Structure formats: C-alpha cells, structure tokens
Amino acid sequence: VEWSDSERKTLVSVWGKI
C-alpha cells in the first residue's frame, strides 16, 4: 500500500499524539 505525502503527514501527526 502506497501512501501519498499528505496522508503520510497525517499519520505522523496521529502517531505523534499517541
């Protein structure tokens, strides 16, 4: 599964909150 740059940034933000 390939994620776009924007989607990856969103994931990083969510993971950072955890």
Curated annotation (Swiss-Prot):
Q: In which tissues is it expressed?
A: Red blood cells.
- Entry keyword Iron: yes
Disulfide links within the chain: none
Q: Name one GO molecular function term.
A: metal ion binding
Q: Subunit structure of this entry?
A: Heterotetramer of two alpha chains and two beta chains.
Name the family the entry cites: Belongs to the globin family.
Q: Identify this protein by name.
A: Hemoglobin subunit beta-C
Q: Name its species.
A: Catostomus clarkii (Desert sucker)
**Which lineage is the organism of this entry classified under, starting from the top rank?**
Eukaryota, Metazoa, Chordata, Craniata, Vertebrata
**Gene that encodes the chain:** hbbc
